[in-house]
């Protein structure tokens, strides 16, 4: 074998090795790409599965809450028709008001209650609050004013709310804000000049930064909201359509009860809440008589009730 032949074969082996390495590199790249693509697709499918599962868990919560409210309404109607009570009643001792605790307890007893998912569910009585859409009415304004004074929320913010829900372009003194103010913002938008659709609109109104951060101390025995168990402004104000509801005195938080009259103090509210827990007020007249007979306060505002019409369902599936 000549040296020329050996050199050619060595060169051929070198070329074959290079081709092999290139093919291996291509195959490795393809395998990595296919593996990554498969992993991504699996993750997408798993995320879709989990999202779909969470959605149906949340939907189940909504249906459960509606069934509980329907059952409560029908029981009230039956009691009224049988003369057991003179009018419908909704209070904090009923199942709908404690549904969050009942659902949590049920999931603790039955780990697979929602097919491996978890449900956080509660029903919030919107009639326990003050309808902020009625702030410009003579009977509602003083109640909102006392709520704001108690938490040291500025008068300017109260005026800005009045301008937000009224139907004119005249600014309320002091501190009111109409479309001219909002259109000069970095991200302009018009003033609503009409009833709020949701209470979250409070965060669109001039002066909201400080006001919506304010908290109200919960009275003894109240749950409050959030980690610290205090009430926020959105816990005390609602935004409901039309004329709006009456305030349910059987479910209203302490700060709302105290805002009903300028002479109601903290101790009186605490006593009323304790008595209400033991024996909810059967009629509005009973609530008025309670404050008149016990504390000499006779001129409570109109638009009070002992039952509720508007509820909000919060259902979160995981």
Regions from the language model: what does each represent?
Residues 2-318:
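Compositionally biased linear targeting/interaction segments
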């Amino acid at each position: 074998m000549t040296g020329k032949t050996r050199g050619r074969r060595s060169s051929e082996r070198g070329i074959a090795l290079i081709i092999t390495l290139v093919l291996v590199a291509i195959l490795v790249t393809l395998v990595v790409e296919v593996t990554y693509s498969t992993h991504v697709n699996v993750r997408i499918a798993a995320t879709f599965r989990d999202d779909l599962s969470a959605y149906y868990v949340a939907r189940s919560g909504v249906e459960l809450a509606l069934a509980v409210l329907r059952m409560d309404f029908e029981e009230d109607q039956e009691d009224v028709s049988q003369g057991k009570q003179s009018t419908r009643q909704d209070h904090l001792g009923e199942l709908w008001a404690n549904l969050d605790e009942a659902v949590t307890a049920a999931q603790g007893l039955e780990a697979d209650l929602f097919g491996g998912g978890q449900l956080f569910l509660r029903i919030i009585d919107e009639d326990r609050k003050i309808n902020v859409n009625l702030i410009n009415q003579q009977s509602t304004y003083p109640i909102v004013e006392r709520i704001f004074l108690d938490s040291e929320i500025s008068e300017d913010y109260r005026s800005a709310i009045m301008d937000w829900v009224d139907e004119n372009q005249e600014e309320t003194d002091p501190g009111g804000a109409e479309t001219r103010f909002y259109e000069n913002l970095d991200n302009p938008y018009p003033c609503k000049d009409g009833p709020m659709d949701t209470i979250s609109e409070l965060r669109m109104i001039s002066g909201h930064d400080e006001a919506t951060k304010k908290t109200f101390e919960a009275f003894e025995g109240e749950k409050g909201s959030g980690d610290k168990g205090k009430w926020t402004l959105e816990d005390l104000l609602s935004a409901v359509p039309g004329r709006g509801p009456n305030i349910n005195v059987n479910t209203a938080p302490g700060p709302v009860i105290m805002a009903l009259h300028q002479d109601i103090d903290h101790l009186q509210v605490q006593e009323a809440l304790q008595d209400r827990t033991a024996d909810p007020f059967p009629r509005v007249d009973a609530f008025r008589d309670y404050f008149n007979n016990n504390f000499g306060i006779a001129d409570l505002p109109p638009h009070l009730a002992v039952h509720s019409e508007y509820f909000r369902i919060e259902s979160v599936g995981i």
